[in-house]
Amino acid sequence: MEQKIKKLTSILFLLLCVPLSAENKKADLIESEAHAILIPGSGTYSKKISTQNKEAQQFFDQGLRLAWGFYFPESIASYLEAARHDPDHPMPYWGMAHAMGPNPNSRYSGMPDDPKGEGFKAIKKAMDRIENASDMEAKLIQALHILYDKDTYPDAKQRDQAYLAAMRK
């Protein structure tokens, strides 16, 4: 019970400290002030990325865990913070694009794909930095780019299928 209270208190503190909406945070703005804090008790899963910056890695991991928990605004804030620590690494921008949508699951509830275009801006930034990615990171970035590629795949179902095929590689 005490662990739950600590976790909820930490999340509440984060909600009070960072903007609650991706609409309020432009994916192309990486400012000097902090966008997020490391939340105690938010998990230990780590997906090593090719950054040499310890803080960027920690915030990337937190962003991934929060996105998997459907805490998308907090996830985006964590990815923004990772990008602040390593602005040339593409994976924080990949994370932002991943958390901002489009999301094949959300379409079933009628949510629009990337209504403000912020996710597209983020994946474009990741693509612009892809030379700084490992081979696996580059494949993840290229696969996620497909979900935003309305020129090649005008139909959302086509994009979903192409994305799934790319992720299977």
Predicted regions span which residues?
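Hydrophobic h-region of N-terminal signal peptides that target proteins for export
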Residues: F13-S21
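Compositionally biased non-globular segments, especially hydrophobic aliphatic-rich helices
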Residues: L12-F13, R129
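Bacterial N-terminal signal peptides that target proteins for export
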Residues: E2-T9
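A cross-taxon signal for low-complexity, glycine/charged-rich
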Residues: M1, A22-E23
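Short coil/linker segments at helix-helix boundaries
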Residues: N24-K169
